[in-house]
């Protein structure tokens, strides 16, 4: 059985990156929350 985590920087950026977050309203809400919390890193 193969492991479930098969790292790929491209997939990581496409799924969890800043531009991916900005596309949807929910994603923008996530960024807003992270800014409010004071996170230094907003997205992957």
Swiss-Prot record:
Signal peptide: none annotated. GO terms for cellular component: ribonucleoprotein complex; ribosome. The keyword Ribonucleoprotein applies. Keywords: Ribonucleoprotein, Ribosomal protein. One of its GO terms (molecular function) is structural constituent of ribosome. Belongs to the bacterial ribosomal protein bL34 family. PANTHER family: LARGE RIBOSOMAL SUBUNIT PROTEIN BL34M (PTHR14503:SF4), MITOCHONDRIAL RIBOSOMAL PROTEIN 34 FAMILY MEMBER (PTHR14503). This is Large ribosomal subunit protein bL34. It comes from Rickettsia prowazekii (strain Madrid E). The gene is rpmH.
